[in-house]
Amino acid sequence: MIDQSIKKLVTYALEKKLIKEDDKIYCTNSLLAILGLDEYNEPKEEYKNVNLESTLKEILDFAFEKNLFPENTTVYRDLFDTKVMSVFVDRPSNVIKEFNTKYRTSPKKATDWFYKFSQDTDYIRAYRVKKDLKWKTATPYGDLDITINLSKPEKDPKAIAAAKLMKQSSYPKCQLCPSNEGYAGRLNHPARETIRIIPFELSGKKYFFQYSPYSYFNEHAIVFNSEHVPMAINHDCFEHLLGFVEKFPHYILGSNADLPIVGGSILTHDHYQGGNYIFPMFKAPIEEEIVFTNYTDVKAGYVKWPLSDIRLSSRDPKRLIALADKILRVWRGYTDEQSFIYAETNGEPHNTITPIAHKVKDQYVLELVLRNNITTDQYPLGLYHPHQELWHIKKENIGLIEVMGLAVLPSRLNKELAKLEDELVNNIDPASDPLTEKHADWAKQIKEKYSDINSSNVKEIVERETGLVFARCLEDAGVYKQDEAGLEGFNRFVERVNKEPEIIK
């Protein structure tokens, strides 16, 4: 049985062109070593269109029965099957050479190849990504993308407990450091033996390009600094974003904000995220045009979007960078008590920006989303953060991906919403169920809104209402609301920018 699985896996690698015919014996013997086997009887049966997921399952089941890992959980299985797949992954220098060769023909050919390679090697577990639930919800801001993430493994209590007993390690320093490439992993750090990273320069500084293993959207890429330095929204950041889309015009690239609450989950390592995807925010129209003094050549406007987005566009990226520098400089120190915007309290800074760059034909576009992380007694996790009544759907930060209109909702909602649908159809009070009690008030609102909820329409209704809750999360994160007072506040800020003198460099 295991001989068949080994042959299938080697055949898969040949089919995907990860290895060549001359590599078969070497790779087979490498697998035997990992599996603790001394011999191999090659099956006569030939295989075609090998299913990677089921073949790896066979190998993992065999390995667990042979006590090659202690617990039959996702954490241990992922560590082991990454070691197995590393047998077929080429050396970094060869991968880089192939990428650069294709890049000279076309940036898109290079990324197409690299994305497929990252899936074929099982670094991106495509069969898991397919399990994510996805739909679109119509809102006043256009269709929002809603996803419930099922591909990222849940934290394993046994692995967490075992990790606490292990000797603590600070290598790699974080999951974005270049030193992850080829790392075998441990219980509290994923295996990265199958990852390959592409080096390149942004403004004369060394960065690397890789894909996210969880692919929240098409060709979800991560661009990260070669050094372990903190995130920072500044001149260099704007230069890097626009420099990247100049190199890869079919991609977008953005940065999480550099402050807690409004930033992402990793603030300690300078990095950006992007990919080959048109986000809902990019489809949103300019609601009102803005004229910035000394920048009449730059098209600018407020975007019709729940967060406060200033869209800048020009053929000249240097002009965008200069204006973005000015807007950021003013925003960092800007206080408007009338709009409850404070640059700092007790020495703690609050104002920052979530920037995103993309290209539309020959125009460079820079989206500058104004953020503020102030907390209050009423909103201890942030005034411009999803408010408490929405936490039953999303309590986490509104980071870069959500800012652009794609909800990455927690996996717990898969079971909770399925149960809630059943309760809505059968008129059961969710408050009586520990799994769904957090949704009880929301369920009442849904019942009041829809007079006829039945088994044929309940899923569509719950999905729509989930999307509308996400839209409200984005509205909460907006520093200027979509009303007259919000527009007046936005205008006051722009007036302040226009009064700011230019810095001569």
Where are the regions that the model predicts?
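Active-site microenvironments that recognize anionic phosphate/pyrophosphate groups
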Residues: 1-223, 227-231, 304-306, 320-324, ...
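Short alpha-helical interface elements
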Residues: 171, 266-270, 278, 294-297, ...
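Helical scaffold of the NTase/Pol beta-like nucleotidyltransferase catalytic core
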Residues: 194-198, 226-253
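Hydrophobic faces of well-ordered beta-strands that scaffold small-molecule active sites
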Residues: 209, 253, 270-272
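Histidine-centered divalent-metal-coordination microenvironment in nucleic-acid enzymes
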Residues: 218-225, 263-279, 369
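Catalytic or ion-translocation cores adjacent to nucleophile or general acid/base/metal-coordination motifs
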Residues: 236, 245-265, 274-328, 332-335
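Beta-rich nucleic-acid/ligand-interaction surfaces
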Residues: 260-268, 346-352
